[in-house]
Amino acid sequence: MKDTIRQLIQQALDQLTADGTLPAGLTPDIQVENTKDRSHGDFASNIAMMLAKPAGMKPRDLATRLVEALPAHEQLAKVEIAGPGFLNFFQDHIWLAASLDRALADERLGVRKAGPAQRVVIDLSSPNLAKEMHVGHLRSTIIGDAVARVLEFLGDTVIRQNHVGDWGTQFGMLLAYLEEQPVDAQAELHDLEVFYRAAKKRFDESPEFADRARELVVRLQAGDPDCLRLWTRFNEISLSHCQKVYDRLGVKLSMADVKGESAYNDDLAQVVADLTAKGLLTEDNGALCVFLEEFRNAEGNPLPVIVQKAGGGYLYATTDLAAMRYRHNVLHADRALYFVDQRQALHFQQVFEVARRAGFVPADMELEHMGFGTMNGADGRPFKTRDGGTVKLIDLLEEAESRAYALVKERNEQRVERGEEPFDEAQLREIGRVVGIDSVKYADLSKHRTSDYSFNFELMLSFEGNTAPYLLYACTRVASVFRKLGQGREQLGGRIVLEQPQELALAAQLAQFGDLLNNVALKGVPHLLCAYLYELAGLFSSFYEHCPILTAEDPAQKDSRLRLAALTGRTLEQGLELLGLKTLERM
């Protein structure tokens, strides 16, 4: 709908340019937003205020001319001028109802991608191996997964790339520690975190051990068979830990998506050679660097992008450049999204620019750093265990499931007290599992990607507010309508007719699902989908309260309201699935 309104506004602008009202050469970015108060219409634009000055007119006068020039359209009932010159657009109720009937009949709910389909690389999760995933890996994993799901739903070809850290000093530490311990790796490495911490302690305390670790890294990089064999085993064990976390989280990541740093080892020398051939490299204290004039430090000196250390070693930038070239040349990506901590913003700005100057990626390939804030504890400080250690992600998920189980068990006892049929133990365990994992994920996804947030079990497990339990309950509420009806959602007849304010408000929200998903895909911000679903659930609650469904006044009204309920249920379920959340029929 927003695209339609933009096109209508553009046609009006063209007409006003042709008749001399507007000067030639204007190319405004036409903004169309949802109104906050639907009594002021469904959509609004400030285009008249944007162009009033170049037109030499008062905003309201220009708004009047724009309304006069707007072509009629079946989707619009009327356009009004508000305040200093806003254009408020009101959807036609008959057209809106018919569009929802079409959405209900469509397995994709009438959602279409705005623009051509693309091949999109999603760089997500990417933990360092040799130790277990911790809470700091949650955001990249689930935000990247949600955006990937939305892009796929819209028709893009999505290629997930788990750029794990499977090379470097940490493996030298583990190899050196393994030399000192007469143990079997298979037996001892089941708790990789304990083994890693012990190796790190030796590395920090013993200069001799640290030197040995660095020596073993060199041997590993030179292809020493024994080092490679143990390195491979470390990676297998570490990746198996990661996969357990991914499965527990319900994210679409598998071993086939792993493309670690080591995969680009053979390309790094060529990256340096190509940068040299392009005249981009400068030697600085023995290191090979690219200096970009637009990136300077506080003293005004250009900041280096180091691609090879003085000793010959390579850095993250070198590997990232090799990966970008691979993603263009081999994966044929039109767009690459990097879900990495926003503290790496400067790094990505620099390597993106180097990649373009070197010709590793073309000018029209979209490279976007989807930075995110940090997850803190309830006290606002970095999330730690009680003894100050790093919280394993798997431990956090287990605690979430345990807390959710206790919560649903308590609510089950309340069902018994009310004389309702209780859930059995297996059902309670499954509900607790879904509620626990969904709550952790939704609490994160519902925050703006770039914001820091405080992790709080009590808030995220609440059945009130913008939480997973609230939305899961909304889904079960819709499902209960059809259980009472004794009929499936796919068997509905009749058509949608919009009469009551609550019906219109719910319908208007449902009609925006496609625009909303396209916005999430464009900006990489799942919190918009969370906010949409939360508002949809609230509007359904108001509709449910004020518009009797099963006891409607006549069969036509009953059919219409059942169809609205069915479309609401499907939209809630589809939206939650795109966020990577499970749903429940009963809870």
From Swiss-Prot:
Catalysed reactions listed for this entry: tRNA(Arg) + L-arginine + ATP = L-arginyl-tRNA(Arg) + AMP + diphosphate
Subcellular location: Cytoplasm
Source organism superkingdom: Bacteria
Motif 'HIGH' region, residue numbers: 127-137
A Pfam entry, by short name: DALR_1
GO molecular function, one term: arginine-tRNA ligase activity
One annotated Gene Ontology cellular component of this protein: cytoplasm
Assembly and interaction partners: Monomer.
Family: Belongs to the class-I aminoacyl-tRNA synthetase family.
Name this polypeptide is given: Arginine--tRNA ligase
Naturally occurring in which organism (per UniProt): Pseudomonas paraeruginosa (strain DSM 24068 / PA7) (Pseudomonas aeruginosa (strain PA7))
